[in-house]
UniProtKB/Swiss-Prot annotation:
PANTHER family: RNA-SPLICING LIGASE RTCB HOMOLOG. It holds the Pfam family RtcB. It catalyses: a 3'-end 3'-phospho-ribonucleotide-RNA + a 5'-end dephospho-ribonucleoside-RNA + GTP = a ribonucleotidyl-ribonucleotide-RNA + GMP + diphosphate; a 3'-end 2',3'-cyclophospho-ribonucleotide-RNA + a 5'-end dephospho-ribonucleoside-RNA + GTP + H2O = a ribonucleotidyl-ribonucleotide-RNA + GMP + diphosphate + H(+). GO terms for cellular component: cytoplasm; nucleus; tRNA-splicing ligase complex. InterPro entries: RtcB (IPR001233), RtcB-like_sf (IPR036025), RtcB_euk (IPR027513). Gene3D superfamilies: tRNA-splicing ligase RtcB (3.90.1860.10). SUPFAM superfamilies: Hypothetical protein PH1602. Its cofactor is Mn(2+). This is RNA-splicing ligase RtcB homolog. Binds 2 manganese ions per subunit. The keyword Cell cycle does not apply.
């Protein structure tokens, strides 16, 4: 029997102005509470979605995000609480922007591919340059075209970096080390990647031949959807010290942001795992509230196979972003007739938005080894954390938050408070407010392109029809999302970037 909206509200408590609690009983079998972070405008969206669901209206066939956060709180082995970040929106199984951690010592604890997502290690990399907006404006169109020519974009796009089957096997195992060996990356790029660009538990044998077949031609390609390469300008510096450590010292400095993932390969790894896990659930009698939350015990063969395959797909995504960095450096050096080195095109940082990782965290005063699922959320470790690079030991880990086409992006830093409240996790971007289908119905792609042109943004798009799905109107306001995290203390604002050119699939 479904409850009325007013009945549902009995299970929701406001903890403080940026955080709500979802009490046990909101959905059946909750082992821990849920929480979600919002500010006033975002809160309205969340409750509106719940109200619509109570009336029988869904969002693209998914449950409302609040219900999804609750269902995750019912998964075996979850600790502390199921957490929704301010950009949370309905997704497959887990909401996108929902993170959860599972106790590795608990033999029943599970891993769920829906808690990582289909685009494994979809993530963002930020490069700096020593160019100014004044240097780029006169050649902006030329530069956008040069990037578009260098980086293969679009749904079925094929890579330009030569790769045979043996190369792919090695790339899946080695991640950025492969790019380094092949001359597509600089040694210091690796230092500035989450996991140093290589997940060591990766096993290419756990990636099906179908997945490899999909991945082989796509390496070094941008893909479609919300993936982009963007030329950006520093618009605001909130923390001078952190910005300087990142090599950003003034407004108007030019940066490049690359947002992409594991393409068809990661999608296939997730699909294969879901099939295997449905069987494992029957065998081990694991029950879940929503069949999209298919999962397997971490210690089971299916659980281990998925984690090894996921790590390989993660490595593929890091190689992919490295390849695109190589192509971006080439494009810039061609337009400015100088070397990428002379342009100071260093990687500030590279973060993952969709991944599950084994980490040490304090839970109820005890140190525990946890499998942390981050889907549409970003690791944000505090200063002095052993897993972040030397350069950022005093600032905290840089967190890259991509806006949507034509809106600002942000660089944040991790905090100690985030470590205790959210397992060192913060938001990842704007988060959808309209489903893709709805965006296509409501928006006209020419209007979207014209609006970008009016804002002085050069744009190159491989599939204009997909532009509406990515229009700023389809998303929550990224500034609301970032400010919520900042005010809640789970990450702090360092830099704001605005786009001057966008290359999209």
């Amino acid at each position: 029997m479904s409850r009325s909206y007013n009945d549902e509200l009995q299970y929701l408590d406001k903890i403080h102005k940026n955080c709500w609690r979802i009490k046990k009983g909101f959905v059946p079998n909750m082992l821990v509470e849920g929480v979600f972070y919002v500010n006033d405008p975002l809160e309205k969206l969340m409750f509106e979605e719940l109200r619509n669901a109570c009336r029988g209206g869904g969002f693209g066939g998914f449950l409302p995000a609040m219900k999804q956060i609750g269902n995750v709180a019912a998964l075996p082995g979850i600790v502390h609480r199921s957490i929704g970040l301010p950009d949370v929106h309905s997704g497959y199984g887990f909401a996108i922007g929902n993170m959860a951690a599972f106790d590795m010592e608990n033999p029943d604890a599970v891993v769920s591919p829906g808690g990582v997502g289909f685009d494994i290690n979809c993530g963002v990399r930020l490069l700096r340059t020593n160019l100014d907006e004044g240097d780029v404006q006169p050649v902006k169109e030329q530069l956008a075209q040069s990037l578009f020519d260098h980086i293969p974009v679009g749904v079925g796009s094929k890579g330009v970096i030569p790769m045979g089957a043996k190369d792919l096997e090695e790339a899946l195992e080695m991640g950025v080390d492969w790019s380094l060996r092949e001359g597509y990356a600089w040694a210091e790029d690796k230092e500035h990647c989450e996991e140093y660009g290589r997940m060591l538990q990766a096993d290419p044998n756990k990636v099906s031949s179908k997945a490899k077949k999909r991945g082989l031609p796509q390496l070094g390609t941008l893909g479609a959807g919300n993936h982009y390469a963007e030329i950006q300008v520093v618009d605001e510096i909130y923390n001078d010290y952190a910005a300087k450590k990142m090599g950003i010292d003034h407004k108007g400095q030019v940066c490049v942001m690359i947002h992409s993932g594991s393409r068809g390969l990661g999608h296939q790894v997730a699909t294969d795992a879901l099939v295997a896990m449905e069987k494992a659930m029957k065998r081990d009698r694991i029950t879940v509230n929503d069949r999209q939350l298919a999962c397997a015990r971490i210690t089971s063969e299916e659980g281990q196979d998925y984690l090894k395959g996921m790590a390989a797909a993660g490595n593929y995504a890091w190689v992919n972003r490295s390849s695109m960095t190589f192509l971006t450096r080439q494009a810039f050096s061609k337009v400015f007739s100088t070397t990428p080195d002379d342009l100071d095109m260093h990687v500030i940082y590279d973060v993952s938005h969709n991944i599950a990782k084994v980490e040490e965290h304090m839970v109820d005063g005890r140190q525990k080894t946890l499998l942390v699922h981050r889907k549409g959320s970003t690791r944000a470790f505090p200063p002095h954390h052993p897993l972040i690079p030397v350069d950022y030991q005093l600032t905290g880990q840089p967190v890259l938050i991509g806006g949507t086409m034509g809106t600002c992006s942000y660089v944040l830093t991790g905090t100690e408070q985030g470590m205790t409240e959210t397992f060192g996790t913060t938001c990842h971007g704007a988060g959808r407010a309209l489903s893709r289908a709805k965006s296509r119905r409501n928006l006209d792609f020419q209007d979207v392109l014209d609006k970008l042109a009016d804002m002085g943004i050069a744009i190159r798009v491989a599939s204009p029809k997909l532009v509406m799905e990515e229009a700023p109107e389809s998303y929550k306001n990224v500034t609301d999302v970032v400010n919520t995290c900042h005010d809640a203390g789970i990450s702090k604002k360092a830099i704001k970037l605005r786009p001057i050119a966008v290359i999209k699939g």
